[in-house]
């Protein structure tokens, strides 16, 4: 199900950078939504209506209202429906569609956008994440941030441990024995994208996977280890 959670903590994961004039949003929506069947037999999960509009519109509207005008959608299952919906609903936005033909994880999905992003800062919002938070404040911040939320059982999530100053010390994807109950909610503002793509490449070269997938969490953990964040 979609994640209905507040942006409980904004965890600083980066050095201070000048605020970008423009920022691209990356929204992975390639999943088949098997947990929501039969609803997703004929439509992608992102187009399921919640509280009067689709999950995808909740996400796009929030980012658009904060000033983001360029979106990269990573599509796969029933991707043509998402592409048609976005073009009809948001004709004034600059949109790109990248196909993830084999769902190999969030890290693999983001890596597919490299040519469109280059080394520009990005805001990544997983396509089933609905949250209430001040997007503009996060975009305008000169630091990279990750959204987290306390949960009772974080073993099915990426998990963050933080220091006394609110900086991330460690990130682990779906740990069997979590060191904290701070789960990643699927919202990421990343300034150091050149390092991000370097770490994603490292995942593929070294075949670093969690439960058979290349995860964005593991790439962010790599960034921490490199000392760039």
Sequence positions of predicted segments:
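Short N-terminal binding/cap micro-motifs at the start of the first secondary-structure element
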Residues: 33-38, 155
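Conserved N-terminal catalytic core of the sugar/cofactor nucleotidyltransferase
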Residues: 7-27, 35, 49, 53-126, ...
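Conserved donor-nucleotide/metal-binding helix-loop-beta segment in metal-dependent transferases, i.e.
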Residues: 133-155
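A structural signal for short hydrophobic beta-strand segments in well-ordered beta-sheet cores
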Residues: 47, 160-162
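Active-site glycine-centered loops adjacent to acidic/histidine catalytic or metal-binding residues
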Residues: 31, 128, 150
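Conserved beta-strand segments of alpha/beta enzyme cores
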Residues: 46, 94-96, 167, 229
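Catalytic-core segments of class I nucleotidyltransferases/pyrophosphorylases
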Residues: 167-229
